[in-house]
Amino acid sequence: MEGATGLRVLLCLLPLLTLQARPALGLATGRPRGSEKRHAVDTSVNGVSIKSLKVNCKVTSRFAHYVITSQVVNNADKAREVAFDVEIPKTAFISDFAITSDGKAFIGDIKDKVTAWKQYRKAAVLGESAGLVRASGRNMEQFTIHITVGAQSKATFRLTYEEVLKRRLMQYDITIKVRPKQLVQHFEIDVDIFEPQGISKLDAQASFLSEELAAQTIKKSFSGKKGHVLFRPTVSQQQSCPTCSTSLLNGEFKVTYDVNRDKLCDLLVANNYFTHFFAPKNLTNMSKNLVFVIDISGSMEGQKVRQTKEALLKILEDMRPVDNFDLVLFGSKVQSWKGSLVPASNANLQAAQDFVRRFSLAGATNLNGGLLRGIEILNKAQGSHPELSSPASILIMLTDGEPTEGETDRSQILKNVRNAIRGRFPLYNLGFGHDLDFSFLEVMSTENNGWAQRIYEDHDATQQLQGFYNQVANPLLTDVELQYPQDAVLALTQHRHKQYYDGSEIVVAGRIANHKLNTFKADVRARGEKQEFRATCLVDEEEMKKLLRERGHVLENHVERLWAYLTIQELLAKRMKTEGEERANLSSQVLKMSLDYHFVTPLTSLTIRGLTDEDGLEPTIDKPLEDSQPLEMVGPRRTFVLSAIQPSPTAHPIDSKLPLRVTGVDTDPHFIIYVPSKEDSLCFNINEEPGVILNLVQDPDTGFTVNGQLIGNKASSPGQHESTYFGRLGISSPTSDFQLEVTPQNITLNPSSSGSMFSWRDQAVLQKDGVVVTINKKRNLVVSVDDGATFEIVLHRTWKGSAVHQDFLGFYVLDSFRMSARTKGLLGQFFSPLDFEVFDLHPGSDPTKTDATMVVKNRQLTVTRGLQKDYSKDPRHGAEVPCWFVHDNGAGLIDGVHTDYVVSDIF
């Protein structure tokens, strides 16, 4: 970060799941905002200001969808370098990234990593990386892109990523690390939570705010299934002192919540996908058999062994009298404290603590011998002592290095451990520091029903060790199996778990075979403290109908993507343990699902068309490996220059399952309205005659207007509906004395005063009084109007020899920021927030489509689920957009009737 040339505006946000709160660095003290007089302050740094920075997190049934949007403005008289700098959790998958600058849109394409690597082989040969995402800490990955923003220009960044929230220690955590490094004109964190089980608690805190300022700026509420947190500080509330131009936003913003546990388990079904949440309450803690296997080789010298001893002493204090335990130490030789399990009596615990305080380091690393000794102790207890066979057995191993003594072949060690445990109990591996093969520890743990965790060499390593132990300290059930009717379920995620711990949650997802919902149920079998556990879960169909009415397409989309996320994660875990043909088959499955669901995973990359660095390379977004080098250890960074958007030779339409975020009109003419609050789209057609001019956008406050004239086919068959398209668009801004006329043949600036004319064969950037027009040869043009809006016009070419069809235009809204709330028009009226509810889903007159009842604008309409094409990103092929189709020229959805939007002139 340091030593970078040029200006860097850092937009740093870190949403991640945390086990423990982490101390924020360089925090400014929050100050009361009472009687202190605030002065107007310049929010820019070297002429560059962050106009807006917004984090939107929408959680539906544990599935979290994040969108980070930031707009920077360069008011300087020369170009500046700007950095968009965001940290995201390692468990998340990026699903979209886009930049809009100077009226140009730069869109990400997800493709297989092999194809992406071939395009960037030059960087690989040079030993450099064009990658934007790198490992940067314990639970995070850092996404950074540097771009050059022209003088008097702006750039908007939008990053989207998704993950499934994991319950730890009785709650779900969302932590957002805030570090903009300068004052932000419009700063906002908006967290919206919908949990069908009902929310039992919700809290939000900011480490960088005083209690008084937090009370003023953090709004939090929850009722029933819904929870909401909003943090929107003013510029004065961001200032570190009344006259300062520096920001106190430097630290963590943390949201925690949990859900009601009134049922033993909850089944959620939507669109033939299901999610099963299992976290029963009021269960008795099981006694446990616990063996710690500790590395005491010479490399543990110093702080590592001191912190390990501190953690072990605290863990021993917390053990219950019903537990049994032993300690195994391995260096060059292997030694155990007792050689067998002993009860956790006060006398035994004190003796064990004395043993921990006294042991010293010795020799190399006989990891294989240490593990086999620990396994032997647990196996012997289960086989020869009936009273010790019922508790939950747990093996925990801590090491900081690689095997150097005894058996050192990793594949043989894996085989030895697997054959010794034989699925009887879980093995948890803790890797201390970076000087070890962490993937080896991961494979070993996952092969034996556990997981691996890295312990970072830091002042809080003791707390990290204790934090891990707290997650497994209280087993409630063992040998948990969630069972479903065999013929009713497809593509099931992991449904057998060796142990279930207090404060956690088991989540299973899958697909339901067609027409099998009536027979769908879940049976749970497990072993509890001295008794068997049995439960049956049924789908509450009435409750599901109610949930679908409340959440509609968002619920359907999130349940399916939750299944996809879990499936990909599990396939990747299996892939890590396999080789040869089996590994290739798993890779193929992961790749297909990653492309289908638009996820950046270890097998895919996201490239950004139109951005190039000094070597002509486009940036690429990859998923870094867990063992990849930290950010400060990698090579030189690369700065990308925004160039005209060009078709990607490997671009492919985004899968039709994805809800694409577009508002626009194209083809016959089909209007698509994206509704962010629902993560869904509405659509309607307008049927009018060729020659009719329709008003698309009109802002009465500024006079900004967009009109479009319809054209028909060259020829039509008698008695058939005549298709119409937009063949002419007129954009005008009276405040800028600006007019633009666009046809499939020409682009004319200020036609009424004989202005300049361009063709679609040109590549040009035009600028007039705050309006920028970018012509991208034979593809599209983008109009950016000051801070008001950004629009795209797409060119559609038909076959030159066609006797029926002719060329036409599509019109899309990329940004309606700052347009007035009074904006009207067939598209403009939807720039303001819109809400709707959909219910009573049923087969329509077309058996392949679903009809439903929609309530919108206090009107009740019949709508049909369908698909429309969005050509904004791929003018040739387009991408299918699921939407609710409103019949009869949008009647009931649009204000008035469609003929109210007929105007007499293109301007």
Curated annotation (Swiss-Prot):
**Localisation per UniProt entry:** Secreted
Q: Which residues carry this modification: Aspartate 1-(chondroitin 4-sulfate)-ester?
A: 668
- What is the protein name given in its UniProt record? Inter-alpha-trypsin inhibitor heavy chain H1
Record's signal peptide: 1-26
Gene3D superfamilies the UniProt entry points to: von Willebrand factor, type A domain
Q: In which tissues is it expressed?
A: Liver specific.
Annotated glycan sites: 57, 282, 285, 585, 650
The species this protein was found in: Mus musculus
Q: Which residues form the VWFA domain?
A: 287-447
Q: Which protein family is it in?
A: Belongs to the ITIH family.
Subunit and partners: I-alpha-I plasma protease inhibitors are assembled from one or two heavy chains (HC) and one light chain, bikunin. Inter-alpha-inhibitor (I-alpha-I) is composed of ITIH1/HC1, ITIH2/HC2 and bikunin. Interacts with TNFAIP6 (via Link and CUB domains).
Q: Which InterPro entries match?
A: ITI_HC_C, ITIH, VIT, VWF_A, vWFA_dom_sf
Which positions does the record annotate as the modified residue Phosphothreonine? 399, 404
The protein's role, per its UniProt record = May act as a carrier of hyaluronan in serum or as a binding protein between hyaluronan and other matrix protein, including those on cell surfaces in tissues to regulate the localization, synthesis and degradation of hyaluronan which are essential to cells undergoing biological processes.
Gene Ontology annotations of biological process type: extracellular matrix organization; hyaluronan metabolic process
The alphabetized UniProt keywords are:
Glycoprotein, Phosphoprotein, Protease inhibitor, Proteoglycan, Secreted, Serine protease inhibitor, Signal
Identify the GO cellular component terms for this protein.
collagen-containing extracellular matrix; extracellular matrix; extracellular region
Which residues are propeptide? Answer: 27-31, 669-907
**In the record, what terms sit under GO molecular function?**
serine-type endopeptidase inhibitor activity
Q: Which domain of life is it from?
A: Eukaryota
Q: Where is the VIT domain?
A: 34-163
Q: How is it modified after translation?
A: Heavy chains are linked to bikunin via chondroitin 4-sulfate esterified to the alpha-carboxyl of the C-terminal aspartate after propeptide cleavage.
